[in-house]
Amino acid sequence: MKMPKTIGLVHFIGIGGIGMSGIAEVLHNLGHRVQGSDQADSANVQRLREKGISISIGHKAENLGDAEVVVVSTAIKKDNPELIAAREKFLPVVRRAEMLAELMRFRNAIAIGGTHGKTTTTSMVAALLDAGGLDPTVINGGIINAYGTNARMGAGEWMVVEADESDGTFLKLPADIAVVTNIDPEHLDHYGSFDAVRAAFRQFVENVPFYGFGVLCLDHPEVQSMVGKIEDRKVVTYGENPQADVRFHNIRMDGATSIFDIEIRRRRTGQVIEIKDLRLPMPGRHNVSNATAAVAVAQRLGIKPEDIARGLATFGGVKRRFTLTGEWNGARIFDDYGHHPVEIRAVLRAAREACQGRIVAVHQPHRYSRLSSLFEDFTSCFNDADTILLAPVYAAGEEAIEGVSSEALVDRIKAAGHRDARHVPGQEALAPVIAKIAQPGDFVVLLGAGSITYWAAALPKQLAEISGNRA
């Protein structure tokens, strides 16, 4: 049974969240009555309001109104007044992933999973399906620049969704195609052990129906190990590994554009298809790998090589994924969501490949628990940066942990041999430091999942004001 149109008014608690807003938008576009609330106004809230969705700022029991269904994310705590009121009224309370799963039942679905790279890969798969004329519905974990939103209602039979593994609910998603980009020890507070994370991703792939398939990255040792354990389901592998079914090679750079070739091998027939000189307007081997995952999906869905090439060449990227926010004195300033050592290392390596000058990395660690559990990994992930500026930890509601701080990380990075690592006490201190060290041709890359995105947006203007005052 598919979700009927008669479910009544749907209320989203925390509707401005990146995952919740996309689901709310698609539900609204399908003709359902949708409303919601959020703690603060935001771009997502404004976008939904412009579509006619009523949104209250602040959480109060009366916000429910005539709601007959309530949708919550894992960020909503049990003492939320709206959640308490919903249960007192005996209303059905639906987890975000459950509602996403209901939407997926209306389409053939592609779910993109992995510890890193999900948002970009979801966007790339959507771009290639668009280029192939399949007009997909998309629900993503980031703003797709081509759409100006994280969700889009298509007329075609396919849906592309980002599968969030953080709380295990991605196992509820009824995907026909499951993509796994990588598996790293994240979200151990939920899973308890890395073995449990591994088991969840294996289940994610084995959940696809017999007529579906998994798309797995053979370059990542954890994913490669999982390939041989997948039972009774088709698997397509991709990566730079010569054994991959869909293999990228011959990477070159043209400024910030990656150029590469792809070789597609069909195991049963031995047929080999080559697509040469693909152009992707993003630097970095990790982005080429993500693009190859998208190609692996697209070619299985019958999209022609010339459409694949066009879709990649015109790919507009994702907000907060190496996003240029401005220039100052010939130095370029970028904003990136990277907050895990694996992500930071990949972003800075990509910056190194594209940059003619020096790399200045500005990082705001996100959560004390993450910095504590991955402290040693953080000491080496900035190696491609010439200068490292570390801001105070963005707590995200956590209590501080003794001995875990940006200052301690600076000391450890220096002890490990880095020549220029510094602590920056806050946003107001950043622009004066950058003004002294940034030179023409340099990249200034701000990284983190917290408020540092606002620093990145404001920095070009702050630098211009400093240079104007000097004049």
UniProtKB/Swiss-Prot annotation:
* MF-aspect GO terms: ATP binding; UDP-N-acetylmuramate-L-alanine ligase activity
Q: Which reaction does it catalyse?
A: UDP-N-acetyl-alpha-D-muramate + L-alanine + ATP = UDP-N-acetyl-alpha-D-muramoyl-L-alanine + ADP + phosphate + H(+)
Q: Which domain of life is it from?
A: Bacteria
Task: Please give an example of a GO cellular component term from this record.
Answer: cytoplasm
Q: Which family does it belong to?
A: Belongs to the MurCDEF family.
Main role?
Cell wall formation.
Q: What is this protein called?
A: UDP-N-acetylmuramate--L-alanine ligase
Q: Which organism is this protein's natural source?
A: Rhizobium meliloti (strain 1021)
Q: What gene name does this entry carry?
A: murC
